[in-house]
Amino acid sequence: MTISRRALLAAAPAAALTGAPASSRPTQDPAARPAKPAATPKTRFAANVEMWWGGLPFLDRIQKAHELGFPAIEFWPWRGKDLAAIAKKTKELGMTVAQFTGWGFSPGLNEAKNHVAFVAEIEASCKAAKQLDCTRMTVVGGNDVQGMTQAQMHEQIIAGLKLAAPIAEREGVMLILEPMNIRVDHKGHCLYGSEAAVRICRAVGSPMVKINWDLYHCHISEGDLCGHLHDGFDQLGYVQLADHPGRTEPGTGEIHYPRVLQELHALGYRGFVGVECNPSKPEADAALGLWHADQW
C-alpha cells in the first residue's frame, strides 16, 4: 500500500496523541525546577537590584537575590545608599558586590571641563568600593556635546580615563567603560558599540581600565556578539546582559544566550555577569531564564 506524504503528515498528530506510550510524552516534573535557579553551574550571575525587586527596601532585595541563588549583586549610583548596611548584608550572606556606577551620564566625561570633577569622583568612588569590597565600577562616557564630533568626544574620554587610571591602579578598582545603544534606550549618547570602546580602552592602555560589555546594548548596536567578543576580549572587564526586544531576562527575546555564554566561557571569562534586565514575570520565574541560558 502506498501512503502519500500528505496522509502521513495528517496522521502524525493523531498518532502522537493516541498511540505514543505515556513514557514518551513530555511531562512537567516539579523536581526538574531548580530551587535556586540563579545558582548556575558555569556562569556567575549578579542580580541588578535596581531592576529586580524594585518595590522592596534595598536590603530586602539583596536577601531575595540570595534566596534565588545569586552569588552577587550590582547596582547603579552608590551615593544615597547605606554602604555600611550593604557591606554587612552581603558579608552575612556570603555575596559579592560585583560592580556599581562610579560615574554616570552627566556631567559628561567627554568634555575636558568635567575632568577635574571626574577624577575627584573616582577617588570618592574608590573609597566606596573599598567599603563594599568591590573591585569594579562602571564609568559612562556622556551624551553628545553640541559642536563636537564623535571622534573629539572619544578623545576627551580617553584623556579623562588616563587621568583616573593611576587612581584605579593604586586602589585596585577597575574602571569599566560602558558603551550604550542609541536605537532604543539612549538616543544621543556618544559611545555605542564595542568597537569604539575597545579603541578607547586600548588607547588608555591601563590594566585597570576596561569595558563593561553589555551584551544587550551591543546586540542592538552592532550584532555579531560572539565575533566582537572574540575581537575585543583583551579589553573586556565585566559583562552584563538582557534579552531583546524588551530588555527582559534571557529566553524572552531573540538573543541565543546559551551560545553567547558558551563563547564567553571558551574565551576564558570567569567573572560575574550582571543581570541588568527587567523581569517579565515574577523574579523566581524570570530567574529560570538564567538557568536555561547556562545550559550548553
Predicted regions and their residues:
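Active-site-proximal loop/turn and secondary-structure-junction residues that shape catalytic pockets
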Residues: M51-W53, R79, W103-S106, N143-V145, ...
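Anion (oxyanion) recognition and catalysis
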Residues: H66, K91, K130, E169, ...
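Glycine-rich, proline-tolerant flexible connector loops at the mouths of alpha/beta enzymes
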Residues: F75-K91
